[in-house]
Amino acid sequence: MKRSNVKELRKLAARIRLETLKVIHSRGFGHVGGSMDLADLMAVLYGEVMHFDPKNPRDPDRDWLVLSKGHAGPAAYATFGLMGFYPMEDAYTLNQPHTRFPSHTDRKLTPGVDLTTGSLGQGASTAAGAALGNRIDGRRNRVFCVIGDGEADEGQVWEAFHFAYAHKLDNLIYFIDNNGYQLDGRTADILDHGDIAKKAAGFGLYTQEIDGHDVQAIYDAIENACAKKGVPSCIVLDTIKGKGATFAEPKREHSSQPGEETWQEAISAAQQALAALD
């Protein structure tokens, strides 16, 4: 990937972080931690990798994103707004009456959302089903699925990996957001997965582990995965929960409800981070 593209993707990630904060701020509270740490991945997917048409979100030949950790919806809403699926301001109605932007993603409400998620683990399975269905239909598109490391407590995730391997779904790439924390604390203290990359590889998936905030590394890992034939892939993203949110990153918070002054400080810091990339 060209150096100029890397710079633009870093800017896009910074914009996604800023807009994610604004989206959640519109409600006053929400899932900041697990949304902010996905900005770099979302920037690479929608800024460089995926085939999609904002004017035709149901294009049958589009690439799919299944945000299995559906509570990170604000990161998706920010990305879709920046990509032109709808005016960005529309997403500033997060979780409010009659909104199209619930806290967890819903394909019937929000343009750009491919599958409804939120019940942890289920997105891993539905992504595998979508990948198999697309292959049966003769389509050459890909399905990308994002799973949280805390979500991987669910046995359904590993059953989905087994299914994907058994059906040789090489049009399916899983990402594990390995930020080390979940709702109730450190993942290692609640249900220790050990070496989660090694575990995914043990289910037969072509597995890579990378810095989840390095856009070049993310792009290269996706390129490697796309080149693999006959097996599904898993990319473990080592991330920092709450990355870029001044009040959430130090505490690795899952959900946050700061005061207005704290919100404004965080938004200002995100604006400065974006400006520094110009």
Report each predicted region and the residues it spans:
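Histidine-centered active-site/metal-ligand motif
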Residues: 31, 71, 103-105, 122, ...
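Generic beta-sheet signal
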Residues: 63-65, 141-145, 172, 231-239
